């Protein structure tokens, strides 16, 4: 007999969600579906915030006004605080939970260890986790001092996210201008430079659930970036499950990664590790001690009955991270195939959107998350970041061939037209990259 997951005890609980943008929309939808009363707050009006438009109640307290949030928690008799994958609001969640005495899956100290790319490199080296060479900015300040640098190199904000401020450079001159760009994006003004692992644009993503210190790998997905040739748009274009690299990763890298996560102090929550597979090694590129923007629980729920979004909400409201039954389900995954298509569009004002209604009628399409609407403007400043994505289409099937037929239909069907009549969805994923 299947054990209770504890979700039924959450009905009527009151959850405060920080941030009303698309980043928290799925959090609000999920919490409402669990019977939870949801209040959404930030400093913008309801008309400007999609998540506020579906919440039970709203407030206009800024998400970094900790004192104001504590007062709101007392006034509304809030039982827990959470947010979506926004790293800015996760930090605010950590602080307000501490101030209000509410549960939080991590502390500010542990969060900072995980979010800082320089810190991550140090932990990788300490535990034998493969990682590419790192170079100090000083190496590029003097002509000739970079003779030992293995180009291309990637310049990143040390504390960045969402692919913002990242540039791939092939010479010293371009590095210097890229450093300025990354410094502007970094909250701390710090920049991180490493050898770019050029493997054709494939990322191996491994996800772990952490329950009272027990670290359990539960999902491995391949992601392919949008622009592997020019390397100007290092954002996701396509993801698939299962990954044919899972067995190799488990045999060669998993044990060291688990030791690293344990040493970082993680006790509960969900974490994803992004690696670049090349020549039998998995080079750790980034990690997130949080839910991901990919919303992969839309796969894991039908696959194995696990939903890390619901788990994190349950924990925020005083419940357990994982039940024993949920841990056991990891080994009972069904034979399913999954794909997620992300659709980067060009800058401009959207006049017309085509194909989304037809796409939603496809029985293999389990979710279409649309970030822009007709009349919205896509700024040039978001090109090359996750803000360039128009939509995220999740597809699932028991048949691999059927899955890829549906993916191809989605690629061919979606159309976004600007006010001058031009197609904005130009960089469509080439399934030939994965042999389909």
Label the model's feature ranges.
Residues 194, 205, 267-279, 324, ...:
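A short glycine-rich, hydrophobically flanked beta-strand micro-motif that places a catalytic Asp/Glu
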Residues 14-16, 153, 215:
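Conserved hydrophobic helix-helix packing surfaces used for dimerization/oligomerization
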Residues 198-203, 207-266, 270, 277, ...:
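ATP-dependent carboxylate/phosphate-activation module, predominantly the ATP-grasp catalytic core
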Residues 130-132, 152-154, 167-200, 230-240, ...:
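Conserved ATP-binding module of the ATP-grasp superfamily
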Residues 321-364:
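A glycine-rich beta-turn/hairpin centered on an aromatic-Pro dipeptide
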Residues 1-110, 320, 334, 371-388, ...:
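ATP-binding N-terminal substructure of ATP-dependent carboxylate-amine bond-forming enzymes
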Residues 271, 359-378:
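A structural supersecondary motif
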Residues 56, 98-165:
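A conserved helix-loop-beta module that forms one wall/lid of the active-site cleft
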